[in-house]
Amino acid sequence: MIYYMLLILPVVLAQDQQHTTESLSTKHHQQQQLSHSNAIMGEAGVSNSQLMQPSTPARTLRPLTAGAGGDPSLYDAPDDCHFMPAAGLDQPEIALTCNLRTVNSEFDTTNFSVIPAEHTIALHILCNDEIMAKSRLEAQSFAHLVRLQQLSIQYCKLGRLGRQVLDGLEQLRNLTLRTHNILWPALNFEIEADAFSVTRRLERLDLSSNNIWSLPDNIFCTLSELSALNMSENRLQDVNELGFRDRSKEPTNGSTESTSTTESAKKSSSSSTSCSLDLEYLDVSHNDFVVLPANGFGTLRRLRVLSVNNNGISMIADKALSGLKNLQILNLSSNKIVALPTELFAEQAKIIQEVYLQNNSISVLNPQLFSNLDQLQALDLSMNQITSTWIDKNTFVGLIRLVLLNLSHNKLTKLEPEIFSDLYTLQILNLRHNQLENIAADTFAPMNNLHTLLLSHNKLKYLDAYALNGLYVLSLLSLDNNALIGVHPDAFRNCSALQDLNLNGNQLKTVPLALRNMRHLRTVDLGENMITVMEDSAFKGLGNLYGLRLIGNYLENITMHTFRDLPNLQILNLARNRIAVVEPGAFEMTSSIQAVRLDGNELNDINGLFSNMPSLLWLNISDNRLESFDYGHVPSTLQWLDLHKNRLSSLSNRFGLDSELKLQTLDVSFNQLQRIGPSSIPNSIELLFLNDNLITTVDPDTFMHKTNLTRVDLYANQITTLDIKSLRILPVWEHRALPEFYIGGNPFTCDCNIDWLQKINHITSRQYPRIMDLETIYCKLLNNRERAYIPLIEAEPKHFLCTYKTHCFAVCHCCEFDACDCEMTCPTNCTCFHDQTWSTNIVECSGAAYSEMPRRVPMDTSELYIDGNNFVELAGHSFLGRKNLAVLYANNSNVAHIYNTTFSGLKRLLILHLEDNHIISLEGNEFHNLENLRELYLQSNKIASIANGSFQMLRKLEVLRLDGNRLMHFEVWQLSANPYLVEISLADNQWSCECGYLARFRNYLGQSSEKIIDASRVSCIYNNATSVLREKNGTKCTLRDGVAHYMHTNEIEGLLPLLLVATCAFVAFFGLIFGLFCYRHELKIWAHSTNCLMNFCYKSPRFVDQLDKERPNDAYFAYSLQDEHFVNQILAQTLENDIGYRLCLHYRDVNINAYITDALIEAAESAKQFVLVLSKNFLYNEWSRFEYKSALHELVKRRKRVVFILYGDLPQRDIDMDMRHYLRTSTCIEWDDKKFWQKLRLALPLPNGRGNNNKRVVSGCLSGRTPSVNMYATSHEYQAGNGGVIPPPSARYADCGSNNYATINECAAAGGGRGYKPIPTSASAAAAACKFNTMNQLSKKQQRDLSVAGMAKTLEHQHHHNHQANRRSQHEYAVPSYLPSAAPAYDSVDYAKQQIRNNANCECVNLGTAKRAAGKNPASGLPSSFSSNFVPPGGASYNCKKSCSCIGDDELLCSCGGGGGIGVNLLESGTQSSVTMSSSSNNSRQPELTHYESNLSLNDDEDEDHDQQKNLWA
């Protein structure tokens, strides 16, 4: 780097002016899109100043050496980029990194041609991941960078990699394309064929995190030098799409299997021959693979590392790893694997080194699976379902080089001694989290190299003397969290090298004798046991013990000789016991001890325990019962001391050790400390925790000499005042941070001694710490009747007060005399306050029992509180000379009289409180001298009269309270002369109802309604009757003989009962109408759910729209791909299975590869109701695509009604105008509505064929989609030997029960039946016969049904050759699924309800009455080849001919006329039916018997299907 810095030369300004700035991203040509992008970019917090600005001549050219010649050449990096020398190269080559917003998007136009081609060998492009804008790479974007060797493009939302994008990059070695489209599911990443045709020298290719769904054929074939490929975190579903399948091992033409080859297989076979690459590393983890097929990686002969972890793989073919001759590391972890084929590692037996299978569902483990893998070094089988049944002497045979074996988190209950017979090189064995209850003798004897044995979290109860025989080099043994109640004294006899022993979490009551004389032991963990007593010789012979953990036991005392045999002990943990007594000198025998934990015990005193321990550095004695502490109790070398949660009232330092101690951390929180001073804290302290104590006083200079101080916690104490000297420290150097103090949570008082605290963080002298929680500090106001507390930072100078009794200013010379106005003397029984400047002087005499004005009230009083006394009158000149008085409280003092001169001299009075007294009248001159008065409170007196002009002189009056008096004729309109009045209170008086007065009063009320705060309560009195003044209809004034009269309206009193009844009826009627309107939806739901008035509320079926009746589906659901689980598992599960709706789901049933608009409209038109699940995922993904919007527009134009299901939180700002319009005009149902299902059923049409087992009719949904069967089925046909082609049924399926360890794949070759009659054609019976197959065990009833299924398949295969053209296409590896699956078998015959009898004449009689399906004739469309004795399902029985022969163990079927027909109940539903059988009485789901997943049509109108079924049953 120094070499390059020396080469940087200044550039002449003339040269600078000749070059213009070039940026990768230039301004878009359309101003409208530019403004739109600025708005979006602004939200994302991205600056566009450099990306979007036009070129400017502000570039400084960067010189670069040109090689050996030494001539510098200029390297001109674009403004969006920065460069650095490429690592690991001697030549001055450049690695360029460009940070862009997007690449060629609607916001930016990107020009990569400005990147200098010379010296640029590495280019890294990073886009802004927060911007969801689609980027684009143009053809030949990097064609000029002919020397480029590394190209990395990340976070750019690319949708396609064209075939000419990489043109010109012939020298490219390393390519990384990570769009991270996986976070934007709506955007896929597609790669065109021949996209890598130019980059033939590519060695490393990373295409991870791109949301790739599929790949072109042989896309990687041109990369002959490729050694590493990363395809992780995509959406790939078929391993064969990678193009690494070895097709040379597939069957040739002319075989029987070729006749049943599916359309997908033909397409694969017709592609070019498989290419062979020299890949050494392949990562396809985090995809959606569910099957690992045979020969899937067969062409990768040199592959060493294969990672297929974190997929959904549930089945692995026998030859899945065929061709991988050099495979060393295989990672199949975090899948759904249940079993593994026996021959999985057949070709890698001599090369495989590491196998990772953890976090699967493996419950079956073939004993031959791992045998003789003599190069295997690591095997991880943890987190599976393996039981001891599958671990025997053959499981690990031949693993002579195995070093690591992980069997943790399984269900092992026992270990046989022969299991580990060949594992003599094993070093680490993990058996944690199993169910082992005992260990047999010599179980681990063969593993003489084992150094780590983990047996924790099992159910071991006792450790036998011979359980650990042979473990001579064992160094770590974990037996924690078992149920051990004892250990044999000789249990560790052969583990002489043991260094770390974990016995915690057991039920031991004493220290095991087996520990004695274990001279190599370094650590012993006996915590969380039940040990109550430790003998003096408990640790005899443990001379090298380093750490001892005894936490969480029941120890009560420690004797002097307990640890005498542990001279090298350094860490001792005795926490959480019941220790109350520790003998002095108990720890002195262990002179090297450095850390001791005694917290959580019952110690009262530690005097003499630790003072003579010079090596002690760390001591925790918290949560005990200590009442006293002195620094002399601990050694001076101690660095960390924890005393929190004790009962300490002080920190004593009798010997003055504050300068000698080396203590750095001290925790004394949660104690009872009341005072701290300089000697309470050592000078070496760095971290001090004093919070949650009772500290009231912090002495000055407490922290003065604590030069290493970094943090002090004083919060949650009882500090009320704090002197500035209490926090003073020595000056801190500029390069060091000031100490941090936390003092919040204290009951500070806003006195005059604490005002400095408000500004302490702004002091620049660096002699005071920083208060980190200053904003949280509140202080209590000493005298404030409006609020008790105030935030310290909001307090004003007038809030910081101090009390005084007497004070004499320096300029006052009469203080020695009695009559001295400049002397401040607080009256008796009063409290006086002042601020720092004495501008605020408060005299508080409230409730002092004065009967007359207190004498000697200070002349400079600014606020006087004399309320709550017993004055009869306020005499004249009572406040004479108090020229500074601004606030006067004389309320609630029984004042009856005030005089004209009472308030003389109070020119500065602002607030006067005289409420709650006994004042009778105001004569007019009482307030004339109060020209600056702002607020006057006279409420709750007995004022009956107020003279005119009483308030005339109060020009600045703003608040006047007169409510609660006895006023009758006061001319309130005179208050208009007070221009600043904003608040008047007049209620609760006895205002006159005389008409003349009342008119003027009302007029004033109308004009001053905003000022009079209680105008609604103002009323007048007439003949002891009260009336609100604003009431106009209740009274009326008339003039008769010049006298105003008040008349009640008695005319209507006789009509009151009638009016009351009419009013109630009116209110009830409109209440009923309003209730029906408000709850109309609930009433509709109730009527629908109870079928109440259904014939009246809804149209009769004969009035239903004929077009809707012809639609095959009840509803079509559109939703986001991210909400697929919610729709499939919750909505569809309930609507289809519980209610019987026929649904079409977008991502399940619609061909999403077709044009979205047409597919969506076609699917919606095939259903009676269109339902859209609106969520945040839909708004951000699908709705952002034009196709969805146009489809929804078209549906609305066709008057297609839309029902919205609102799922999750919907951000309002992200809902555009179109969606808002649809939401306003459509039915919306919220998922979290408690009546969601009722409302949804009300919004949907009645299901077709209600009451039947309705199949989902997807003819309208699947238009243009190729039907296929279950590609993930588990059966023999999915093997390399068959090439993915389903063979015809043969007799070899009948017997496979003899092979006890056969998988489904091996059933075909197995021989010897196990309780089955030879059924020549039943592959399903073969599957059921396998004892240890990968599928669930079948019941007898299921075996019987499967046998019947085999016969049906036989007849279907006979019809196969005649009607090959009518067969539906099938996936390349698809096989029939004969076992229970998630797909229901509709219209199944319930044989559990039939009465089946064995008959000597082979007559299958009295089968019972079958149920009719959908109310149609079940016999319609039946094949004519049935026996003439056949009775339709509506009849009473099936009678076979005398010549019939029985088929099956329980005579379920009859073969009549030499096999000419089979009696099977064939039910019909709609236009399609499945030949199925059920074994449960409640129509539970059972496998279909058809060879394919297609259904047999029984409609007479379909001639082709009718012919097919006749031939099928011929």
From Swiss-Prot:
Function according to Swiss-Prot or TrEMBL: Toll-related receptor which binds to the neurotrophin spz5. Functions in olfactory circuit assembly by promoting synaptic partner matching between olfactory receptor neurons (ORN) axons and projection neurons (PN) dendrites partners in the antennal lobe. Involved in the targeting of specific classes of PN dendrites (Va1d, Va1v, DC3 and DA1). Functions with Toll-7 to regulate motor axon targeting and neuronal survival in the central nervous system (CNS).
Residue intervals annotated with topology Cytoplasmic: 1079-1514
Phylogenetic classification of the source organism: Eukaryota, Metazoa, Ecdysozoa, Arthropoda, Hexapoda
GO biological processes: axis elongation; convergent extension; dendrite guidance; regulation of synaptic plasticity; signal transduction
Membrane topology type: Single-pass type I membrane protein
Segments annotated as LRR repeats: 145-168, 170-191, 199-222, 224-246, 276-299, 300-323, 324-347, 349-372, 374-398, 399-422, 424-446, 448-470, 471-494, 495-518, 519-541, 543-565, 566-589, 591-612, 614-635, 636-658, 660-682, 683-705, 707-729, 858-881, 883-905, 906-929, 930-953, 955-977
Protein's name according to its UniProt entry: Toll-like receptor 6
Cited InterPro entries: Leu-rich_rpt, Leu-rich_rpt_typical-subtyp, LRR_dom_sf, TIR_dom, Toll_tir_struct_dom_sf
Residues spanning the membrane: 1058-1078
Listed GO CC annotations: plasma membrane
Positions annotated as glycosylated: 111, 174, 230, 253, 331, 359, 406, 494, 557, 620, 708, 829, 891, 900, 948, 1024, 1033
Family: Belongs to the Toll-like receptor family.
Entry-linked Gene3D superfamilies: Ribonuclease Inhibitor (3.80.10.10), Toll/interleukin-1 receptor homology (TIR) domain (3.40.50.10140)
SMART domains from the UniProt entry: LRR_BAC (SM00364), LRR_SD22 (SM00365), LRR_TYP (SM00369), TIR (SM00255)
Annotated signal sequence range: 1-14
TIR domain mapped to chain residues: 1111-1244
Domain of life where this protein originates: Eukaryota
Compartments where located: Cell membrane
Main localization (coarse): membrane
Biased composition (Low complexity): 255-273, 1473-1484
Species this protein is from: Drosophila melanogaster
Disulfide bonds: 752-802, 826-832, 830-845, 993-1020
Result of knocking out the encoding gene: Viable. Dorsomedial or dorsolateral mistargeting of VA1d ORN axons. No effect on the immune response to septic injury using a mixture of Gram-positive and Gram-negative bacteria; adult flies are able induce expression of antibacterial peptide genes (Drs, AttA, DptA and Mtk) and mount a proper innate immune response.
Segments in the Extracellular topological domain: 15-1057
One Pfam assignment: LRR_8
